[in-house]
Amino acid sequence: MFKKMDKKAAQRIAMEYRAMISKESLFSIGQNSNNIYEWTAVIRGPDGTPYEGGMFNLSIKFPTDYPFKPPKFTFKTPIYHPNINDEGSICMNILKDKWTPALMVEKVLLSILLLLEKPNPDDPLVPEIGQLFKNNRFQFDQRAREFTARHANN
């Protein structure tokens, strides 16, 4: 049973990868040449946000029972954000309890872009940053811009 699940996961991952590289997108992706279960992605910081101009690297690791379990998305580029911690973990419901097999990597990446545009300070992974976002948006934006300039200018 495990091998059958593993094969189905690999087929789905390969299909999603082919679909994503065959069209223009808001992000670029790559695949570990030795492991189909490991991808990289680069997201450009959305215009009009403190992340504008930044290039953010992420790793994507798929479980062997994908798509029944979500892949793990991790920011490798440090980012100042209430829903992303120092280890690069992302607090997003579609990566946890709202995950369904119908979701695909492209949809998650688009959701991450939206999270950069509209952080959710009411469900922060980093409470101090969430509080700053709510109480002093100017200072939050300034810190996020400085962090982006320091870490995300590839």
From Swiss-Prot:
Coiled coil: none annotated. Keywords: ATP-binding, Nucleotide-binding, Transferase, Ubl conjugation pathway. One of its GO terms (biological process) is protein ubiquitination. The active site is at C91 (glycyl thioester intermediate). Pfam families: UQ_con (PF00179). Its EC number is 2.3.2.23. Accepts the ubiquitin from the E1 complex and catalyzes its covalent attachment to other proteins. Pathway: Protein modification; protein ubiquitination. GO terms for cellular component: plant-type vacuole. Residues 8-153 form the UBC core domain. This is Probable ubiquitin-conjugating enzyme E2 31. Induction: By biotic stresses. The keyword RNA-binding does not apply. Belongs to the ubiquitin-conjugating enzyme family. Transmembrane segments: none annotated. GO terms for molecular function: ATP binding; ubiquitin conjugating enzyme activity. PROSITE patterns: UBC_2. It comes from Arabidopsis thaliana. It catalyses: S-ubiquitinyl-[E1 ubiquitin-activating enzyme]-L-cysteine + [E2 ubiquitin-conjugating enzyme]-L-cysteine = [E1 ubiquitin-activating enzyme]-L-cysteine + S-ubiquitinyl-[E2 ubiquitin-conjugating enzyme]-L-cysteine.
